[in-house]
């Protein structure tokens, strides 16, 4: 059996509520910029939820031909824009000689929800003949991968993961394993989501998952007293990851190394996490085992931290159970306090934050930290970014259905 290949991050692309590229998103994260505001895309008057993390000053026609864009749901559009940025950042040349060894693995938690709503109205109002022939290709979650592959010409391993809020992290983890075992030289991977629609807002509201707080400064407050649910966000986070051999051969810039991946199932409940965060704890331990490290080796953890009453507390318990005494010295921040919860895209954005934290020796804060929950007594990097020399960083994603996914990143050393 051949030795596992080392896997490094060489490119990044982002669309988020705090920036339309990686540079802006990261700068605003370090500044503690709040990307949550009143929803403008739909009329929220009938709903109890009125806030979300929308993209700002973003026009898809600046990036994709208008005719082509009309044949894609927003989640696919976002993936293409972020993937192009990541590939450009990596200076990755996809040509007839390399295409077979470059793959795409991008997930979406719910796919084309807006497309479904439009098509359903057409069907009900005007009958089946008015439903677009592009309806199914626009709807299905794997189409982000499909369209990015077509757009960039990448012909290697090609797939999509759908694990709700763990989607982005699971996608990167699966792509990591593909490169690690030598099935591809590079993968374009991450998550994308466009969930700010009538049906998504109504559905998540019905499940009592969303915050009904109309104050943009307190609606999303992970690990704080009085938190009442998550605030939805939209966007995409895409990485180019590749074997160290490939990256060094072409002189690529390396942000960080991916060294561990753990994924588990709760087998407990369709929306609630397992008691004491047992499933998340096992995923964190699996990721550390995969990386060959111990809890004391990790300096920073980008938490799932969605601002739900049960979810935050269970994640804190999981961290304490996994890290033991080392949890007292761990920096743990929830960047969702700034971006909102991007569902399937969140793991991609937070992988970018984790890698840049290592590279820049800075940790983005948990903003809105003014009324700490005494049961969530970790160092959550309150309100202001902190300088921190990081060797290992971890990123958690925990999804409806009991999906738990964790990645471990390492400061790159040749």
Swiss-Prot record:
GO terms for molecular function: 3-oxoacyl-[acyl-carrier-protein] synthase activity. GO terms for biological process: fatty acid biosynthetic process. The active site is at residues 165, 304, 341. It comes from the Bacteria. InterPro entries: 3-oxoacyl-ACP_synth-2, Beta-ketoacyl_synthase, Ketoacyl_synth_AS, Ketoacyl_synth_C, Ketoacyl_synth_N, PKS_Beta-ketoAc_synthase_dom, Thiolase-like. Disulfide bonds: none annotated. Pathway: Lipid metabolism; fatty acid biosynthesis. Residues 4-411 form the Ketosynthase family 3 (KS3) domain. Its EC number is 2.3.1.179. GO terms for cellular component: cytosol. PROSITE patterns: KS3_1 (PS00606), KS3_2 (PS52004). NCBIfam families: fabF (TIGR03150), PRK06333.1 (NF004970), PRK07314.1 (NF005589). PANTHER family: 3-OXOACYL-[ACYL-CARRIER-PROTEIN] SYNTHASE, MITOCHONDRIAL, POLYKETIDE SYNTHASE-RELATED. Involved in the type II fatty acid elongation cycle. Catalyzes the elongation of a wide range of acyl-ACP by the addition of two carbons from malonyl-ACP to an acyl acceptor. Can efficiently catalyze the conversion of palmitoleoyl-ACP (cis-hexadec-9-enoyl-ACP) to cis-vaccenoyl-ACP (cis-octadec-11-enoyl-ACP), an essential step in the thermal regulation of fatty acid composition. Belongs to the thiolase-like superfamily. Beta-ketoacyl-ACP synthases family. This is 3-oxoacyl-[acyl-carrier-protein] synthase 2. The lineage of its organism: Bacteria, Bacillati, Bacillota, Bacilli, Bacillales.
């Amino acid at each position: 059996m051949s030795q596992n290949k080392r896997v490094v991050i060489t490119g990044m692309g982002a669309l988020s509520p705090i920036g339309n590229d990686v540079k802006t998103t990261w700068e605003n994260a370090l500044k503690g910029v709040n990307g949550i505001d009143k929803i403008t895309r739909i009329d929220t008057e009938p709903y109890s939820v009125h806030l979300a993390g929308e993209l700002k000053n973003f026009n898809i026609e600046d990036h994709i031909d208008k005719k082509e864009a009309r044949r894609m749901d927003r989640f696919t559009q976002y993936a293409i824009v972020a993937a192009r940025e990541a590939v450009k950042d990596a200076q990755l040349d996809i040509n007839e000689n390399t295409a077979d060894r470059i793959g795409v693995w991008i997930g979406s938690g719910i796919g084309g929800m807006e497309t479904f709503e439009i098509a359903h109205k057409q069907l009900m109002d005007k009958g089946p003949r008015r439903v677009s022939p592009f309806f199914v290709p626009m709807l299905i979650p794997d189409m982000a991968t499909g369209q990015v592959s077509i757009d960039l010409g990448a012909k290697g391993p090609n797939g999509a993961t759908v694990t709700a809020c763990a989607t982005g992290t699971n996608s990167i983890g699966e792509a990591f394993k593909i490169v690690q075992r030598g099935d591809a030289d590079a993968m374009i991977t991450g998550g994308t989501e466009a969930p700010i629609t009538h049906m998504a807002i109504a559905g998540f509201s019905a499940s009592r998952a969303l915050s009904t707080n109309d104050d943009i400064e307190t609606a999303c407050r992970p690990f704080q007293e009085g938190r009442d649910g998550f605030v939805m966000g939209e966007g995409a986070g895409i990485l180019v990851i590749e074997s160290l051999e490939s990256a060094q051969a072409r002189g690529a810039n390396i942000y960080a190394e991916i060294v561990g991946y753990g994924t588990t199932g709760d087998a407990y409940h369709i929306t609630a996490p397992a008691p004491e965060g047992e499933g998340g704890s096992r995923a964190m331990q699996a990721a550390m085992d995969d990386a060959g490290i111990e809890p004391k080796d990790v300096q920073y953890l980008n938490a799932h931290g969605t601002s739900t009453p049960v979810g935050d507390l269970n994640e804190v318990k999981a961290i304490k159970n996994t890290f033991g005494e080392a949890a007292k010295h761990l920096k743990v921040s929830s960047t969702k306090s700034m971006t909102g919860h991007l569902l399937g895209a969140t793991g991609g954005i937070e992988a970018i934050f984790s890698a840049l934290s290592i590279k820049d020796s800075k940790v983005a804060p948990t903003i809105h930290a003014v009324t700490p929950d005494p049961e969530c007594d970790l160092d959550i990097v309150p309100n202001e970014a902190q300088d921190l020399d990081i060797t290992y960083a971890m990123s958690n994603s925990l999804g409806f259905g009991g999906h738990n996914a964790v990645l471990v990143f390492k400061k790159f050393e040749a």
